[in-house]
């Protein structure tokens, strides 16, 4: 379906880029200054996808239902997806997760996103959400674009921070493998 192909393409780009960026990341780089660190940003990217797709699809979050919260050593709180209003600077600073755990959770959220997008019709995308705090009321398509915006922003921050830590700034042309910073 044309309406969802563009969204699937965009989410696939985030998926592939996150895999390239985290493939050879070290534990020290996941928590290195400046903040927020790469590890927390990668976690947040996946949490935002998980929480929003679960709500849109009327399903339980993978974070809770599939035990990801426990694997991360965190409470299974459905509203905890890294909003600045819920995470303090200290909580972000002490966040720890391996690249493998971050990618495993992201893989699960990506697969759910992909499966969900493949089921949507034009009518589904046009459905208004019952969120009166927003005017006009957002549609499913608008929400998915918001989730995509967050994912792309977080992935861009992750890619920048990797270059910052390894090269002293955004100079991918100086890297041995410039594609690993794309």
Residue ranges and their predicted role:
Residues 1-8, 30, 96-103:
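Active-site rim elements
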Residues 7-16, 115, 119-123:
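An acidic intrinsically disordered interaction segment
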Residues 8-12, 16-19, 27-83, 130-182:
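Short, contiguous alpha-helical
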Residues 77-127, 142-149:
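Acidic/histidine-rich alpha-helical segments that form the ligand environment
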Residues 11, 15-18, 22, 106-113:
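Hydrophobic alpha-helical core bundles mediating ligand binding, dimerization, or RNAP-core interactions
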Residues 21, 25, 120-124, 161:
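A short secondary-structure junction motif
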Residues 2, 26, 37, 88, ...:
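Helix N-cap and loop-to-helix transition residues
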């Amino acid at each position: 379906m044309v309406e969802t192909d563009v969204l699937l393409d965009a989410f696939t780009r985030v998926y592939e880029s996150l895999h390239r960026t985290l493939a050879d990341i070290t534990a020290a780089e996941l928590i290195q200054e400046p903040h927020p660190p790469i590890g927390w940003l990668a976690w947040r990217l996946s949490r935002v996808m998980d929480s929003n797709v679960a709500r849109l699809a009327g399903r339980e979050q993978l974070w809770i239902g599939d035990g990801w919260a426990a694997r991360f050593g965190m409470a299974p709180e459905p509203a905890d997806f890294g909003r600045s209003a819920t995470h303090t600077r200290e909580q972000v600073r002490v966040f720890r997760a391996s690249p493998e755990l971050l990618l495993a959770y992201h893989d699960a959220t990506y697969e759910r996103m992909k499966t969900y997008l493949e089921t949507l019709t034009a009518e589904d995308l046009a459905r208004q959400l019952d969120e009166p705090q927003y005017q006009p009321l957002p549609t499913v398509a608008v929400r998915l674009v918001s989730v995509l915006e967050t994912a792309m922003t977080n992935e861009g921050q992750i890619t920048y921070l990797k270059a910052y830590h390894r090269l002293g700034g955004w100079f991918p042309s100086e890297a041995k493998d410039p594609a690993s910073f794309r």
